[in-house]
Amino acid sequence: MNHETFLKRAVDLARDGVNAGVGGPFGALIVKDGSIIAEGQNNVTTSNDPTAHAEVTAIRNACKALGTFQLDDCILYTSCEPCPMCLGAIYWARPKAVYYAAEHTDAAEAGFDDSFIYEEIDKPAEERTIPFYQAGMFQVLCRRSE
């Protein structure tokens, strides 16, 4: 298996997406047994969906194609080191490996800086830029419905 060939395809998807005006410069694909199962491009702006990142789109397409929610026999190739949201989706999908071309610092230099999200994750919930509050009475209601 030639990882460079698949990484080149991910970069081509990113470039094609920008040229077509579908979203940011990100592309990803899922490979199983040396064959491309699914691809994804960043479609955030055209779909008005902030979760439509290339990796998430590729994961959704691969899971649909394979009829499963786990990709444990697959490899994900992406044009850039995944953001925190995509990283979470990748761990839930459980591919056996991830290969990426550019680093997240390269994305930041291009205007796609996600470092603030990593900083937010480390803060206590109530100190985040968007405060998170745990509503105690609903926790009790959830326990009663079990």
Can you say where each PLM-predicted feature lies in the sequence?
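A short, polar/charged loop-to-alpha-helix boundary motif
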Residues: 46-56
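Helix-adjacent hinge/juxtasegments
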Residues: 52, 59-93, 97
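Short beta-strand scaffold segments in enzyme catalytic cores
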Residues: 25-34
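Residues that line or immediately flank small-molecule/substrate-binding pockets and catalytic motifs
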Residues: 44, 78, 102
